[in-house]
């Protein structure tokens, strides 16, 4: 009985060790996720909405929560951004992400908290908080869920 218990305990320990990420993998994942966000920020500041959207999972399963509304799908999210920031009478402004806290949930998932700040041509400065869920796909890290809330 003791032998069986020892074997089972060893197998559990081996499986747990195999599933845990190395510190390097965790740091590499965090850097890759931050790179996606910086690439999005740069694309936004070039008024490149398609480049900004490249950071999102191009799937009907993408979810976006903001302003008390729930949006589903990459195309619907793009349409929302276009209507609010890239249509006549609406400007994209300059975007800055700050206070990023990236937590790896595994080797292929991450949770991000942060702040956004927009500086608009008319001098207004919308800002707020966001939480993001990232997943790692064959083509890289993508946002699969975005919850953004603007400050009042």
Regions found by a protein language model. Give the residues of each.
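Bacterial N-terminal signal peptides that target proteins for export
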Residues: 1-8
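Short, low-complexity N-terminal intrinsically disordered segments enriched in polar/charged residues
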Residues: 13-55
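Hydrophobic pocket/interface hotspot
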Residues: 40, 52-53, 61-62, 73, ...
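A short gly/proline-enriched turn/hairpin at secondary-structure junctions
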Residues: 55, 61-72, 86-90
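A mature extracytoplasmic/lumenal domain signature
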Residues: 57, 68, 101, 114-116, ...
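Surface-exposed, charged secondary-structure patches
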Residues: 76-122
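Short beta-strand edge/turn micro-motifs at domain boundaries
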Residues: 127-152
């Amino acid at each position: 009985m003791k032998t069986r218990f020892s074997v089972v305990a060893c197998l559990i320990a081996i499986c747990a060790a195999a599933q845990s990420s190395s510190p390097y993998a965790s740091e590499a994942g965090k850097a890759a996720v931050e790179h996606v966000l910086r690439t999005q920020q740069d694309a936004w500041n070039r008024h490149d909405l398609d480049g900004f959207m490249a950071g999102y999972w191009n799937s009907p399963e993408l979810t976006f929560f903001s302003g008390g509304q729930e949006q589903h799908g990459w195309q619907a999210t793009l349409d929302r951004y276009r209507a609010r920031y890239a249509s006549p009478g609406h400007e994209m402004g300059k975007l800055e992400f700050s206070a990023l806290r990236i937590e790896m949930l595994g080797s292929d998932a991450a949770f991000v908290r942060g702040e956004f700040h927009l500086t608009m041509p008319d001098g207004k400065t919308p800002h707020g908080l966001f939480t993001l869920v990232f997943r790692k796909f064959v083509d890289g890290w993508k946002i699969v869920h975005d919850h953004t809330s603007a400050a009042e």
